[in-house]
């Protein structure tokens, strides 16, 4: 790199997040470009922290398994499935099941989430993946 680009880079490293955001807006206006195309490079850290809109296009890798409801006659079976999946004690698992809709597990892989969903639905629970 040239001395000029090194100097610019060092200046950019000292910017706060708010200042960097303002700089991006000014660059977009001055050059008639959009930072959305290069968001993966320029906005990598903020995108990871503020997930949402950007992730809609990408396939999710982490899921929350949420027990929405269950058949009253299947409460004990659902309770056993939740205990097995979470490793919770009887009292904690019972409280979790009775608090439905309630997240049973959060941030699990797609395979694990689907397996847990299948196990709970087989015994009478209604589960969604978020």
Curated annotation (Swiss-Prot):
CDD domains: Ribosomal_L7_L12. One of its GO terms (molecular function) is mRNA binding. GO terms for biological process: translation. It comes from the Bacteria. GO terms for cellular component: cytosolic large ribosomal subunit. The keyword Ribonucleoprotein applies. Pfam families: Ribosomal_L12 (PF00542), Ribosomal_L12_N (PF16320). The keyword Nucleus does not apply. Keywords: Ribonucleoprotein, Ribosomal protein. Homodimer. Part of the ribosomal stalk of the 50S ribosomal subunit. Forms a multimeric L10(L12)X complex, where L10 forms an elongated spine to which 2 to 4 L12 dimers bind in a sequential fashion. Binds GTP-bound translation factors. Forms part of the ribosomal stalk which helps the ribosome interact with GTP-bound translation factors. Is thus essential for accurate translation. Belongs to the bacterial ribosomal protein bL12 family. This is Large ribosomal subunit protein bL12. It comes from Synechococcus sp. (strain WH7803). The lineage of its organism: Bacteria, Bacillati, Cyanobacteriota, Cyanophyceae, Synechococcales. The gene is rplL.
